[in-house]
Curated annotation (Swiss-Prot):
Forms a ternary complex with MCM helicase and DNA. Component of the archaeal exosome complex. Residues 279-302 are annotated as: Disordered. It comes from the Archaea. This is DNA primase DnaG. Residues 172-248 form the Toprim domain. It catalyses: ssDNA + n NTP = ssDNA/pppN(pN)n-1 hybrid + (n-1) diphosphate. GO terms for molecular function: DNA-directed RNA polymerase activity; metal ion binding; poly(A) binding. Keywords: DNA replication, DNA-directed RNA polymerase, Exosome, Magnesium, Metal-binding, Nucleotidyltransferase, Primosome, Transcription, Transferase. Residues 290-302 have a biased composition (Low complexity). Its EC number is 2.7.7.101. Binds two Mg(2+) per subunit. It comes from Pyrobaculum islandicum (strain DSM 4184 / JCM 9189 / GEO3). Mg(2+) 1 binds at residues 178, 222.
Amino acid sequence: MGALTIVAKYMIVAQIEVNGSVDKSDIIGALFSQTEGLLGKDMDLRELQMMGRIGRIEVEISEKNSKTKARIYIPSNLDRYETALVAALIESVERVGPYLASVKVLEIKDLREEKRRKIIERAKELVKLIEEEILPDTKEIIERLKEDVAKAEIIEYGPEKLPAGPDVDKSDSIIVVEGRADVVNLVKHGYRNVIAIEGISKGVPQTIIDLSKKKSVTVFIDGDKGGEIVLRELIKVAHIDYIARAPPGKEVEQLTAKEIAKALRNKITLEEWLAQQKAAGEKTESQMSPQQPQLTQTQPTTAEVQAPFDLSKKIEEMLGTLEAEIYDANWTLLKRLPVRELPDFLANSNDSIYAVVMDGIVTQRIVDLATKRGVKVIITARVGPLTKVPEDMKIVTFDQITQKT
């Protein structure tokens, strides 16, 4: 079917069967000639076509066994009554050339209805486009508002101008994350005591190191290898208390409120993290720091640690408990507590402490707190990465003592 010459309201679709071989021009000629004058001049096909009331007649033809079958299309700009008359008119054709023929109208299409249907379908698509891309839902608006408010609350902290929440100074504890986007996400969800290190390419910022000496520190890392690298750099120079981790493959900046709360709720102590690394077969100390603790010179052997009881039996008793015992200068037991509570105890106790025996890992933070309390002896299951140990402090491992007995 070719192009139409008018903007039609209706389309008459008819089928003609001819008992002989004819072409398109024969069929169109028969339509004009055999209907001429039947309904008067006003309904003559030629006159209607000249006035633009009907369009160009199109014929799709096929021939088989010396018979011709064709589909006829007549576009009409008449009203529905006049269009119906034209349709009935062409059914009156009985011959094409010398051959008998029959015409049957198959349908009269309302082209305006087809246009209306397409318009409605397109309108539906556009409404969906508006709903999905132009008009955000209430939840999205609230999330945008939260993020805008969070960004407005972000401050620049310290000489390095690190991105931080507004409560870093006021809070006794802080959450250390990697980047500004992490800070924005945590502040958005109500965690205002957060600060970012902004990468470790230039080392850990001094501001973070200084804060870690005064506050309880939770490092919140991404759930990938990059997060572990950041953590190891922090452990070298800062006093880390707890470690929280995003789910595997996720970054802190991507987490929902529930995911953040769960990760922080499941945080572990540095000692527990180091123990997990060992259990996983990782050589944690060699990966984390080139400054491994040296148990010579500054760490005397067990012969230099004197106690009024059998230290080997004490170690056997302590193994597997994850607890610590606190002693005064007379080796009188002052307190027994979980290793994870040891840093807080050392920071807040007014007791005169001489020795600590612990089934855990000595970290730099524990050494620093013990130094402030005047501790002279630490007997421990393991020694973590240390950067400084007082000359008058003895740090001895369980293995050193048991190997000497």
